[in-house]
Amino acid sequence: MQQFYCVKEVLNERLKRGYEFAVKNEYIEEKVTEKLQGIAATARMDGFRKGKVSPEFVRRMYGESIAGEVVAQVIDDISSKFLKEGDFGGIVTSGVEIKAYPKVCSNSEGDGGLVYELKFEVMPEVPVVDIDGITLKEIEVNISQEDVDEFLEDLKANYPSFVDVDDESRGVSDGDRVTISYRSAFKGKALRGGSAQGFTFVLGKGQLLEQFERQIVGMKKGESKEFKLEFPLDYMAKHFAGKEVDMHVTVERLSVKDEINDRETLASKCGFGSVEDMVKFATDGLNRRFADMGSVVAQRELLEHLDASYSVDVPEYIVAQELGRMRRELEEGDLNDAEALTKEAEQRVKLGMLLMKVATDAGVAVEVNDILSFIRVNYSAYGRSMEDVLKLFKNREDFREHVKGKVLEDKVVRYIISRAKKDRQSMSAGELKSLFESV
């Protein structure tokens, strides 16, 4: 049977395409009969010799299920051939809806042929990005003495020095370093892991439950105190979660921040050989910080340029996937403006497609070291072991594709920035910070 189906276009809207296929019933019947004959030739059934089962009996037994298999196979064969031979470019996603089943599968009236619709989205034509036509800010910051002083103040705050308090009338307050011993009990029984000797922490840093820290405020060196403490339901130690326990706490040692008013002492406390070494450390640190901030500003400027300069029809299916990811990432309060969220998802997809076009044209590819570096910075630095993240990368395809996509996008952005024209601008640290915060 040469022409066993006909096809007509039913949808052509932006990237969406739709085609209706009508397959002759005779073709379906022929395929079903072939399969049933194959079963009859090999079937073993009570009352029949092998290969002697009547075709009518086989059709009654297996006809409906075989017809379903044939329909599925016919749809797959026709659709695959149609998409392969059609000039559609890349296919984003496709779906089939059966409009009418063949008569062999049902008691439908008419000629009984199979009718189904194949709908799909095609990949858009993405324009070539003109890297030579891009100009980005290259920011140079003039580091002032005030910037260095501010850096050293941060250094002093981040690496505080403490001195013991001998005044027994001095109560504990925020910022003090406290050494305590404590024990806990639930219904009169000691809790596993609920006691410690010589435990040291800085009050107000969130190292302990807020309710616990509030009870410590005002206590004096050598003082003991008993109080009830309720652990939250989501507390990481499950045998504490949701319990109200009896606590007994003793303050063993109290230290306060030692005010350092000269650079020589600060340099010595922080392990520098000299004040000059410390100032060089500060200057180098500021240069790195400002370079990172300038890089973020350039990236934002690049993405804004691409968004404003190029138009791309984005596939709805990919936008819906991106929107789903965004909803999972955002807090509930950020989900109210559905229109703005959809617009951002469309923008992300558009920029991603432009960057992938650059990657393809320029031969930018993801290397193993790129992935390891990305994981080290974005996951391992936040308490996840490299081994755990790599295991997740190996076993979860969605996570693997997410990481590879982010790595490639970052690499392409750096590639474009390195080749774009530069508008060198000199500014103060304050001006750069304002620009950075507006990104």
UniProtKB/Swiss-Prot annotation:
It is an enzyme of class 5 (isomerase). Residues 175-260 form the PPIase FKBP-type domain. GO terms for molecular function: peptidyl-prolyl cis-trans isomerase activity. Its main location: cytoplasm. GO terms for cellular component: cytoplasm. GO terms for biological process: cell division; protein folding; protein transport. It catalyses: [protein]-peptidylproline (omega=180) = [protein]-peptidylproline (omega=0). Belongs to the FKBP-type PPIase family. Tig subfamily. Consists of 3 domains; the N-terminus binds the ribosome, the middle domain has PPIase activity, while the C-terminus has intrinsic chaperone activity on its own. This is Trigger factor. It comes from Anaplasma phagocytophilum (strain HZ). The gene is tig.
